Amino acid sequence: MQAILSSWFVQGMIKATSDMWLKGWDERNGGNVSLRLTAEDVTPYESDFYPQPRHEALSQPMPALADCWFIVTGSGKFFRNVQLDPADSLVVLQVDSDGKGYRIFWGLTNGGLPTSELASHFQSHIVRMGVTHGHDRVIMHCHATNLIALSYVLELDTAKFTRELWEGSTECLVVFPDGVGIVPWMVPGTDAIGDATSEQMQRHSLVLWPFHGIFGTGPTLDDAFGLIDTAEKSAEVMVKVRSMGGKKQTISTEELIALGKRFGVTPMEVALRV
């Protein structure tokens, strides 16, 4: 048996959370990450599991996730400290066979619970499992500075917000041709915001929480991080463009269409018509 601290998924979570903090996206205990695992991923580390796993109830049944394994950031844990004490900052859990609760097999050594946004993560995992036929395994939430800033000055319309980001950096249309979904401002940590987010995840791999942050998804931690990083870089460009007096020229609709054809992606049609 191997030590779970050296596992690819613990090490991956350490790197992702450290990188997110260094980017300035996750102040204090802001942000949360979850990675769906397989039984094969966790089996080699069973010797590190708690002999009597603690059981917790879910806020609503999630039968679609029955028996699924996850590694998740802990509630109230600072991302800057994950690298210092991953065993307290992270948690490996398995959803019950009836989907009504979960058991904590490793982590949270000083007590506590998984992220307060667990409902949002799980609801989005269910949707992305269906949309991508199980390919997407990561849900990542952070407080990306410039995306938040743009939510104060741009109309909160999916097509218009997406178009702005596509124009902010040539690679954006290639990286997220499905655009950015937007939910209304809502109280975080509730089933309601989880419902709204997962509904947008049916069509978008990025979902903006105005005045709060961004949700991203992908097959790997690198994919989800890179997705958010790309959108945030474009948002930073557009914040700077506004500070310099606004656009004098930009990428045209025809050029965006040509870009999609060159890279074999289908851009969200409504964003092309803005």
Swiss-Prot record:
Belongs to the aldolase class II family. RhaD subfamily. Its EC number is 4.1.2.19. Catalyzes the reversible cleavage of L-rhamnulose-1-phosphate to dihydroxyacetone phosphate (DHAP) and L-lactaldehyde. GO terms for molecular function: metal ion binding; rhamnulose-1-phosphate aldolase activity. It catalyses: L-rhamnulose 1-phosphate = (S)-lactaldehyde + dihydroxyacetone phosphate. One of its GO terms (biological process) is rhamnose catabolic process. InterPro entries: Aldolase_class_II_sugar_metab (IPR050197), Aldolase_II/adducin_N (IPR001303), Aldolase_II/adducin_N_sf (IPR036409), Rhamnulose-1-P_Aldolase (IPR013447). Its cofactor is Zn(2+). The keyword Ribonucleoprotein does not apply. It comes from the Bacteria. GO terms for cellular component: cytosol. Its main location: cytoplasm. CDD domains: Aldolase_II (cd00398). The active site is at residue 117. This is Rhamnulose-1-phosphate aldolase. SMART domains: Aldolase_II.
